[in-house]
A protein has these predicted regions:
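Extracellular, repeat-based ectodomains that mediate carbohydrate processing or recognition
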Residues: 1-245
Length: 245
């Protein structure tokens, strides 16, 4: 990941027999600097598809990882630490969602926002453990200040694909979030929503692939933006024809 000055940061997870460690390094003009540890734990959910990430800008850094919360295979929480540059120290770890339900929470995207805040978007499975019948995976987002305090939080979509990555980018007019939706007919196409003047737009399909699949393909979209230009890439396989759109 890079900050607005073009400095490149790399984060990764290493494991031994006892614990997992999240660390990062910054690329200097000569080499990668000495790795620095963000957090360690012996109860993390470590997975190839849903993994920790680092967000960096001039005001500091934010890092997240996934921590097992109960006995279910996919019962895990999103944990995060914040590094305000003016304090030059990591905050205590906190859980970014406040539902308190042991369910799947993950597939996070993080984006530097206004005045040192961070926009964090994630898949939230609280409704899959509640209601009769049980609900669906939801898409939620929140704004967090430099200390990690929650400033705002929203449900962006009440029914989305269960385990596809989310992605976000900052445009000239504000943030855009893209993700894989899930209709009642099991059509799982890519949708987008934008935060404009404090309100999220109604999610809309980027393209009507009409890919109907009764299961999660574990393959979300990726978005990038520069000024008013936005580019999104994603995988689709309607009629068993795989392609990148």
């Amino acid at each position: 990941v890079a900050n607005e000055s073009g400095e490149i940061y790399l984060s990764w997870v290493s494991q031994d027999t006892e614990q997992a460690t999240l660390a990062f390094s910054r690329l200097t003009s000569e080499d990668w600097d000495t790795p620095k540890v963000i957090s360690r734990g012996n109860n993390w959910f470590v997975n190839w598809a849903d993994f920790p990430a680092l967000s960096v800008d001039a005001s500091g850094m934010v890092a997240h990882w996934l921590q097992i919360s109960a006995q279910g295979t996919y019962d895990y929480d999103i944990r995060a630490r914040f590094y305000p540059k003016d304090n030059a120290t990591w905050t205590a770890a906190r859980t970014i969602h406040t539902d308190g339900i042991s369910a799947e929470h993950g597939f996070v995207s993080m984006l530097p926002f206004d005045n040192g805040t961070t926009l964090i978007t994630w898949l939230d499975g609280r409704e899959t453990k509640q209601g009769n019948p049980l609900g669906a995976m939801t898409l939620r987002a929140g704004i967090f200040d430099k200390s990690g305090a929650n400033v705002s939080e929203w449900e962006l979509d009440h029914r989305v694909c269960d385990c596809c990555q989310t992605s976000s980018a900052m445009t000239e007019k504000g943030p855009i979030v893209v993700y894989r939706d899930r209709s009642s007919e099991e059509v799982r196409d890519i949708y987008a929503t934008r935060l404009i003047e404090g309100a999220w737009t109604l999610p809309q399909p980027l393209h009507n692939d009409n890919w109907q699949i009764a299961g999660c393909p574990v393959n979300g979209p990726s978005v990038a933006a520069m000024n008013e230009r936005v580019a999104v890439a994603w995988f689709s396989a309607k009629d068993d024809t795989p392609k990148i759109q």
